[in-house]
């Protein structure tokens, strides 16, 4: 099981004004700050086996409603998963995830059959959040040299933009309603 270093967890909390998360193999969500949970979903509230960004994007209807370019985002997530399969072809958790997605999503089956391998370390996502409306956020995905299977993904908006204002509103408007995310339990797998 992958672990997030305490210093990295501290960094996530320190960049509390912007959504940030640590992704592991298969795009497992290993940790996220409060803004990531407000913007996307509270992955810590999900069963351990469901704390996966690709799984959430493909199978959760709230993700389909959130991403304005859902098909593009989902197809890119499938391409990144295929890249992970290439790096770790005999990983049982990866094979289980691919099987689950194939059983439950026709889109996934089509994209998987296309054999597209891709990974973007930076880009833009367009969202329609149920509380703050439309956002356009840039993301950067940074590799972590101490653990090549972990990445830090940070989402930001251009300063002074309506998206920046929406993130501020989301942060302040929901501050009392959403508790700080709990770290993953040691017995998670």
Locate predicted features:
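Hydrophobic protein-protein interaction segments
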Residues: 2-189
């Amino acid at each position: 099981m992958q672990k997030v270093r305490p210093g990295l967890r501290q960094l996530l909390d320190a960049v509390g004004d912007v959504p940030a998360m640590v992704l592991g193999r298969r795009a497992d969500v290993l940790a996220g700050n409060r803004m990531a949970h407000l913007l996307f979903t509270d992955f810590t509230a999900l069963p351990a086996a469901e704390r996966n960004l690709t799984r959430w994007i493909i199978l959760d209807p709230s993700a389909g409603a959130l991403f304005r370019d859902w098909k593009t985002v989902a197809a890119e997530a499938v391409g990144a998963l295929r890249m992970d399969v290439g790096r770790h072809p005999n990983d049982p958790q990866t094979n289980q995830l691919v099987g689950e997605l194939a059983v439950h999503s026709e889109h996934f089956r089509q994209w998987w059959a296309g054999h597209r391998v891709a990974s973007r370390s930076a880009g833009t996502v367009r969202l329609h959040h149920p509380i703050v409306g439309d956002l356009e956020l840039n993301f950067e995905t940074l590799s972590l040299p101490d653990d090549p299977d972990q990445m830090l993904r940070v989402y930001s908006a251009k300063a002074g933009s309506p998206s920046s204002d929406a993130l501020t509103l989301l942060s302040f408007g929901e501050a009392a309603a959403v508790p700080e995310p709990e770290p993953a339990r040691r017995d998670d797998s």
